[in-house]
Design a protein with these regions (language model features):
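Basic, flexible linker segments flanking DNA-binding modules
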Residues: 1-37
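Long, charged, low-complexity intrinsically disordered regions
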Residues: 23, 27-30, 43, 74, ...
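Short conserved beta-strand segments at catalytic cores or DNA/RNA-binding microdomains
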Residues: 37, 48-50, 54-71
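Acidic/histidine-rich, metal-coordinating catalytic segments
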Residues: 48, 100-116, 138
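Mobile genetic element proteins and their domesticated derivatives, centered on retroelements
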Residues: 48, 62, 68, 87, ...
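Active-site beta-loop-alpha junctions of metal-dependent nucleic acid enzymes
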Residues: 52-55, 72-97
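RNase H-like two-metal-ion nuclease catalytic core shared by retroviral integrases
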Residues: 108-110, 132-149
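Short, surface-exposed basic-aromatic patches at helix termini and helix-loop junctions that form
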Residues: 118-130
């Protein structure tokens, strides 16, 4: 029997999305710790993406640390635009005053889907909605509540 019948053809490698490393300036985990020392009453929300099949639908999970509550939003693609659209929708539906009380600080990993912090932090008029901080690479323990649920 020919060997080609038994083996599947090789898949081409997909091009990885490049993450702008400049977006992390002033948003590192050390900056997060400093901010929390200055603002201990801030509501912290940890965000992460849960992928199933590559190229398939993706979950955006938001874990509220103080409330021990986790929300999940289904996205069609694992890109920055889909994350921004979810926060835009929440901002409109909850109204700015309620959104500001619920989402104060957002702690994220270094995924390409979170590489546009300006769109998350500010609304269309330039008003600050929340503050975005990033965990260090390969440090899932820094947002342990989100990773364990």
């Amino acid at each position: 029997m020919p060997r080609t019948v038994r083996m599947r053809p090789r898949k081409n490698k997909s091009q990885a999305l490049k993450v702008d490393k400049g977006c992390r300036k002033g948003r590192t985990y050390e900056d997060f710790l400093k901010f929390m020392e200055e603002n201990p009453d801030s509501v912290v929300c940890e965000g992460d993406s849960v992928e199933g099949v590559k190229g398939g639908k993706v979950l955006l999970t938001l874990f509220f640390v103080q409330q021990n509550l986790q929300l999940a939003f289904l996205r069609n693609y694992n890109d920055s635009r889909s994350v921004t659209e979810i926060f835009e929708r929440l901002y409109i539906e909850l109204r700015p005053d309620i959104f500001g009380k619920i989402f104060d600080v957002l702690l994220l990993d270094n995924g390409s889907e979170f590489s546009n912090p300006q769109a998350l932090e500010f609304d269309a008029q330039g008003n600050r909605r929340l503050r975005v901080f990033y965990c260090d690479p390969s440090s899932p323990y820094q947002k342990g509540g989100c990773e364990n649920n």
